[in-house]
Regions:
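N-terminal leader/targeting and assembly helices and adjacent pre-domain segments
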Residues: 1-129, 135-136, 185-196
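Compositionally biased, intrinsically disordered/low-complexity regions enriched for serine, proline
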Residues: 71, 147, 168-169
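Processing junctions and N-termini across compartments
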Residues: 111, 145-148, 173
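Generic recognition of flexible, low-complexity loop/linker segments
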Residues: 129, 165-168
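Aromatic/histidine-rich interaction motifs
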Residues: 133-163
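C-terminal edge-of-domain segments
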Residues: 154, 167-186
Length: 196
């Protein structure tokens, strides 16, 4: 029992380290994007966003390989699903960023890009963290570290007004403060038609 507990704690500590590394990388990219916006180098912003997502994905793969070894490495089918998700996310990001450039003045663009960055760029890491820790560890709710109480501004409207969903796999955020209103990992519903 003690060995199992120690192993779970080790996995928890490892996931915290990898999460901090991912968030630090996102912060670095955020600084780079702010600089690119100031220089109006909008084409390079898309590359920076994609680079951020891809590196988050690579960190998750490295985490699985180093922590659990090749025997417990995700199946090939799961790797293909990850790659498909990467491309889908990139295409979705391109659409969102293009839309941000077409709307409003520079302040509006900066706000929209900032929101996209803080959500979309970490979605791959968050999704991977929950799926991996749910499979290997009982501390998934701790390892994710995504849930928080809504702010006063959100509570005032009961979490129902001025709330936006930014990204398919992410919780709703207030567009101004971007706090998490409510977060419950989404579960894929079984298709009754397929099971019939």
């Amino acid at each position: 029992m003690e060995q199992l507990f120690a192993k779970a704690i080790h996995r928890l500590n490892s996931s915290e380290k990898i999460l901090k590394k991912a968030l630090a990388y996102v912060n670095d990219i955020e600084d780079e994007i702010v600089e690119l916006v100031e220089k109006k180098q909008y084409g390079r912003i898309k590359l920076a966003m994609w680079d951020c997502m891809y590196n988050n994905y690579r960190m998750m793969v490295d985490f699985v390989n180093s922590e659990y070894g090749t025997e417990e490495e995700p199946e090939e089918r799961n790797k293909i699903e990850w790659n498909d998700y990467l491309w889908e996310t990139e295409n979705d990001l391109r659409t969102k960023i293009d839309g941000a450039f077409l709307l409003g003045d520079s302040i509006s663009i900066n706000r929209r890009l900032d929101t996209i960055l803080k959500t979309e760029c970490t979605s791959i890491f968050n999704k991977g963290m929950y799926s991996i820790m749910a499979k290997y560890c009982d501390y998934a709710e701790i390892c994710g570290g995504l849930e928080s109480d809504p702010c006063i501004k959100c509570t005032k409207y009961g979490g129902k007004h001025d709330i936006e969903w930014i990204g398919e796999h992410l919780p709703p955020y207030h567009p101004e403060c971007r706090c998490v209103v409510k977060y419950e990992p989404r579960k894929q519903e079984d298709n009754d038609d397929d099971n019939a």
